[in-house]
Design a protein with these regions (language model features):
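A nucleotide-sugar donor-handling region in carbohydrate enzymes
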Residues: 1-62, 175-187, 191
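Short, charged/polar "capping" segments at the starts of alpha-helices
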Residues: 55-56, 89-95, 155-158
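Short hydrophobic signal-anchor/transmembrane segments that target glycosyltransferases
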Residues: 62-77
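Catalytic donor nucleotide-activated moiety binding site of glycosyltransferases and closely related
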Residues: 78-111
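Conserved active-site histidine-acidic residue motif and adjacent donor-binding/catalytic loop
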Residues: 110-118
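A donor-sugar binding/catalytic signature common to diverse glycosyltransferases
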Residues: 117-159
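C-terminal amphipathic helix plus adjacent low-complexity
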Residues: 156-208
Length: 208
């Protein structure tokens, strides 16, 4: 259970990030499975874009700012961009993003065909993530790459606790309009929870 939920109960394992399947082994296996992606010009920032929910609001201006920032990154340093949207991403905003990035080497997930999400994470040099999605932030952190956070309007105390903890650990930073390189410590929450559950299962077998 993530610490920011503050559900302290016997038998509950507290984690900083969400438990997720974006392991280093899975990302490595997916990384070069798709030749067309593997040959895209580098550097490759990947943008994980969501949308409005009951806590956060993704205003149209934020879509413009994200597209402008990504285009600026490509203009200054070249490379490619990989875009992942969610079910909450506004279709108009996503279309605008694609239009503004149309002159660059881009690829985006639209929910059709094979899911390339883990390939995108594995190939990215930097993973920009919308701050309203704990799971996406946690999966991006599993890459060990820099994870700048795209701030949205809104939020609450629970999300604030999560982001403060991730920044304090050196895992994420606020996105400031440019790509910064830093050493991103990979959270060990998934391994730690898996090991604890394994020990618990072994204990039950011995008592049976």
């Amino acid at each position: 259970m993530p610490k920011h939920d503050r559900l302290h109960r016997p038998g509950v394992i507290a984690t900083r990030a969400a438990v997720h399947p974006a392991t280093q082994a899975r990302l490595a296996a997916k990384r070069y499975r798709f030749p067309a992606l593997a040959t895209m010009p580098r550097p490759i920032p990947s943008g994980l874009i969501s949308g409005s929910n009951r806590i956060y609001r993704s205003a149209p201006r934020r879509g413009d700012e994200i597209a402008e920032a990504l285009a600026g990154i490509l203009c200054r340093g070249g490379g490619s961009v990989l875009i992942t949207s969610s079910r909450r991403t506004h279709a108009a905003g996503l279309a605008l993003l694609r239009e503004q990035l149309g002159g660059f080497s881009t690829a985006s997930l639209d929910g059709s065909g094979e899911n390339l999400y883990f390939a995108y994470l594995g190939l990215a040099d930097t993973v920009l993530v919308a701050g309203d999605y704990v799971a996406m932030v946690s999966e991006a952190a599993g890459t060990g790459k820099p994870v700048p956070i795209l701030n949205l309007d809104g939020g609450n105390a629970k999300f604030a606790r999560f982001h403060v903890a991730m920044r304090a650990a050196g895992i994420t930073r606020p996105f400031c309009g440019r790509i910064e390189g830093w050493s991103d410590p990979v959270p060990d929450d998934t391994k730690r929870v898996g090991a604890a559950l394994h020990l618990f299962a072994l204990g039950r077998r011995k008592r049976a």
